[in-house]
Amino acid sequence: MQGRLSAWLVKHGLVHRSLGFDYQGIETLQIKPEEWHSIAVILYVYGYNYLRSQCAYDVAPGGLLASVYHLTRIEYGVDQAEEVCIKVFAPRNNPRIPSVFWVWKSADFQERESYDMLGIRYDNHPRLKRILMPESWIGWPLRKDYIAPNFYEIQDAH
């Protein structure tokens, strides 16, 4: 079933894939990494000016990594907000997705956390570096194929 935003994107010739609706009735779309930045700008201009959250997850061991964006459009009031969920998948051997920091500033720390935990590189992010783990940490702790070290010493811990 195609939602309202998906129909609008089709009408304007914008490449995407409808993934239906989640359990709360929120339309979910899949966007290719190479299309994501331009579609993000279009969605912002269309009225999705609030990035509610961004997260990422490992789809399956050895499989794809996903970056998920929950966008909100408030046109007629807070009680009538329109939401959409965007999923952008990337291969685990070179997970690169365009950053939307320059579209929604609130993506800053959220994209950094996704980089820190899963190793997704957000191209053109101004400060893409670890935010939770020490800079010396090896690997991406939330990947399903991550092997935790037996011992890790944090220098200068008090």
Swiss-Prot record:
Report the enzyme's class at the first EC level: translocase
Which GO terms of the cellular component aspect does the record hold? chloroplast thylakoid membrane
Give a yes or no for keyword Translocase in this entry.
yes
Q: Which GO terms describe its biological process?
A: photosynthesis, light reaction
Q: Which Enzyme Commission numbers does its entry carry?
A: 7.1.1.-
Q: Where in the cell is it found?
A: Plastid, Chloroplast thylakoid membrane
- Could you tell me the keywords of this UniProt record? Chloroplast, Membrane, NAD, NADP, Plastid, Plastoquinone, Quinone, Thylakoid, Translocase, Transport
Q: Transmembrane: present as a keyword of the record?
A: no
- Reactions performed catalytically: a plastoquinone + NADH + (n+1) H(+)(in) = a plastoquinol + NAD(+) + n H(+)(out); a plastoquinone + NADPH + (n+1) H(+)(in) = a plastoquinol + NADP(+) + n H(+)(out)
A Pfam family found in this protein is Complex1_30kDa
User: For this UniProt entry, what is the primary localization, expressed as one broad class?
Assistant: plastid
Give the GO molecular function terms: NADH dehydrogenase (ubiquinone) activity; quinone binding
Query: Membrane topology type, per the record?
Result: Peripheral membrane protein
State how it assembles: NDH is composed of at least 16 different subunits, 5 of which are encoded in the nucleus.
Q: Which family does it belong to?
A: Belongs to the complex I 30 kDa subunit family.
Could you tell me what this protein does?
NDH shuttles electrons from NAD(P)H:plastoquinone, via FMN and iron-sulfur (Fe-S) centers, to quinones in the photosynthetic chain and possibly in a chloroplast respiratory chain. The immediate electron acceptor for the enzyme in this species is believed to be plastoquinone. Couples the redox reaction to proton translocation, and thus conserves the redox energy in a proton gradient.
Name the record gives this protein:
NAD(P)H-quinone oxidoreductase subunit J, chloroplastic
Annotated gene: ndhJ
